[in-house]
């Protein structure tokens, strides 16, 4: 894979028709304010995020402020959702978190004000302020 579409050791990204697909093997990069995700400049064009199951983590602040994002599909196999991963995704209404996810870090879905409910594994570890107070969290047996 070309270096310009890398977003982790062995993890790549592709953006087409509003769908951002994360594929490959391993953990995504944890992005920061000073080193944002490579698609940050196009954040307002992303409507769907697909994370394939061979990717083990969703990187910190990876999809921060993707304000057009409505649908997130995380495939079974992903284990971690890092801090602030979807912070400020104000249009997000459909979120699929597989039972393989065992840890969701601080503020991962902070500011996702359109989200109403989510289902996670019953022993999933949650840090502080993962979801807005308005989100109904349901638990399923892992």
What are these regions (language model features)?
Residues 59-62, 82-87, 105-110:
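Consensus positions within tandem repeat domains that build extended binding/scaffold surfaces
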Residues 38-41, 57, 61:
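Amphipathic alpha-helical interaction surfaces in cytosolic regulatory modules
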